[in-house]
């Protein structure tokens, strides 16, 4: 992933260029799978994050198609400055993606845990995944660890929602049902206690 900071006054040109490139190249199975998200909140609000999705890191050995890259450099590259590049690895054992779950809104939480807190941090994530599965939580949650380009033990947890209305709905009854299942599986008030342990690891 890479953060893109759009230059002042260039937002319309940038977004138009990204849309054209996406329409022209992202529908091909042979092209690299790029996704561009606008950041809506936080310190990087109004910037963008550009992600190249790969099934395996081996795909980095294959360069992006020269024609596709040239087109991106023509229609989008003049309008932004680049931030640091990072490689993230999805942890399937900690992620929960129910069949048919999707959404155009992502809530992404970044964590940087201390070395001493690794066990508490990942035990909580394992338990959340199990509670989601057993409670029938209907939205996706993906957990990614930083494999390269980060200073520290960085993890991002990505929640998918069907817009803000979907986010509000997901954090209502489905979230409460997941927490109840968590406490049923691991003991009274286990969710709150384990959450506090995670907070202490950060």
Predicted regions, residues:
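Short S/T/G/P-rich N-terminal loop/turn motif that feeds into the first structured element of a domain
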Residues: 1-202
